[in-house]
């Protein structure tokens, strides 16, 4: 081992794009970033498709990105894995056990999930396959639709609803029960007032009532409300859940289903309805004691585990929105803290959308980081700045430019702090977002992630080096080389430090 320590700074949603038009990063005031890329070695990293275990041209996301960063290998992601395993869904033993209990109780099955082809949290085809399997098994099904508008265009819900309606039109035992924008049904920041509105529509049939889903969406559009923010509402004569019913969550990403599933499965008060027969696509969390249709495979010898096995200290810092990413996902789906691993969560601002506070909690993260650097205790510090992604998702380019300038100032403070220390600053991102903010073809804001590469920069390294282009799974091996720690055989990524010269 060397005396070096590493700070891995993940600029969530910061991509590279040579086109400066509608590019919040290129248009923002970034003197420190400009200085960084002019004097330190850099390369490009791919964050999408097969390079991160996703289908070809499938946009990456924060979960996939952090799994790839932390594991140091290409992990076949849940989207691809489930695409294969769901072909035999009618014979899935977990589904058959679930449906047998529904039949014994004379209940019905509630299916809930994000109706989207964004591929980030869910797959529309997965929901349709499960509906078909339940219909085949003679189970009555009601569907609770979560609308996207974030990983898809802001006004695109009717496209997916029409696909769903066309698919179920000849299935007499299947109907649509409720609709909710993901702002309510998929909150992950403990804003339980939002989650409660979605829960009340599902559990009790509370909310404005519409004859059909098309009318519900169109009414919200007429009021200026886009997909993500559509207020939970009820379709037809749906009256709510019964304790004898079953519940399937079709999202395969965990962070945005935990709150709503906790409300559905755990007793909250005497007026609360819970469904004990609940199942998910994967194991979402140790917080949720529910089975899954497609069990996850364990990822061993991640970067965090290796650092711990070396008896070295490591630290993770992020604000609420990205805390799970630098901990749970970075550790390969492990919730337990490694030995000598410390975690600090900085609360995210309590606002409706982050364009209202584009600084988010970046300054607080930076101040905390600097205090920890000065302790000279940690061999590895991992931080995530959420601004470029979370503000970028709003589609507000002016606010996103402010977010980028905030990050630039934070980078300047970090560089000043590590000057004349043994800390090496490694800067990268999990995917792009802020560098491409308008869809010219459809003449609307572009709020999703991008296919652009992200930067990889190594600052404060004691000798001159060159960096190769690569993929996210190459970052952990690079850090191990800097720390002079042997790369385990499970890590199939390669160090990006170019030793050809």
UniProtKB/Swiss-Prot annotation:
Pathway: Carbohydrate degradation; glycolysis; pyruvate from D-glyceraldehyde 3-phosphate: step 3/5. InterPro entries: Alkaline_phosphatase_core_sf, BPG-indep_PGM_N, Metalloenzyme, PGAM_B_sf, Pgm_bpd_ind. Mn(2+) 1 binds at residues 389, 393, 449. Its EC number is 5.4.2.12. GO terms for cellular component: cytosol. The active site is at 62 (phosphoserine intermediate). Its cofactor is Mn(2+). GO terms for molecular function: manganese ion binding; phosphoglycerate mutase activity. One of its GO terms (biological process) is glycolytic process. Substrate binds at residues 121, 150-151, 182, 188, 253-256, 322. This is 2,3-bisphosphoglycerate-independent phosphoglycerate mutase. Keywords: Glycolysis, Isomerase, Manganese, Metal-binding. It catalyses: (2R)-2-phosphoglycerate = (2R)-3-phosphoglycerate. Monomer. Catalyzes the interconversion of 2-phosphoglycerate and 3-phosphoglycerate. The keyword Hydrolase does not apply. Coiled coil: none annotated.
